[in-house]
């Protein structure tokens, strides 16, 4: 198993990816590696090519992206024997009940609407870390 937890941040918006990473890093700098991925196609390619050392501990996934969107990628991840165990958090600007229900139906572990302040984002990422990424000793 990897020395660090790998967190895949899948979002087509570079600014959003960096903000999410910064929120995680605000209180959880140790034992985390952040890998930015731009869309669902590249996410699935990463997962297929990853060995045990590079397997992610968590996927943060936007829904609306060019190419294979988050819904399609989530469906493929959760249908895969190899990847379905990876906690997947849908993290999107959508606050639609339909998007939330579809995400859960596809196997998302959590659905979060992107907050409007950095402090709220830090609170959310702290909760995610406590739930799915315990400190490694």
Predicted regions, residues:
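Conserved acidic segment of CheY-like receiver
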Residues: 4-24, 59
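Receiver (REC) domain active-site loop signature in two-component systems and cognate sites
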Residues: 65
């Amino acid at each position: 198993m990897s020395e660090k937890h790998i967190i895949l941040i899948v979002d087509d918006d570079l600014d959003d990816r960096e903000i999410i990473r910064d929120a995680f890093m605000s209180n959880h700098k140790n034992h985390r590696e952040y890998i930015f991925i731009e869309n669902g196609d590249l996410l699935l390619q990463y997962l297929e090519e990853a060995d045990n050392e590079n397997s992610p501990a968590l996927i943060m996934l936007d829904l609306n992206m060019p190419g294979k969107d988050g819904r399609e990628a989530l469906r493929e991840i959760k249908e895969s024997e190899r990847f379905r165990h990876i906690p997947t958090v849908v993290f999107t600007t959508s606050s639609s009940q339909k998007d939330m229900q579809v995400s859960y139906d596809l196997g998302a572990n959590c659905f979060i609407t992107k907050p409007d302040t950095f402090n709220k984002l830090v609170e959310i990422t702290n909760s995610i870390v406590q739930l799915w990424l315990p400190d490694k000793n």
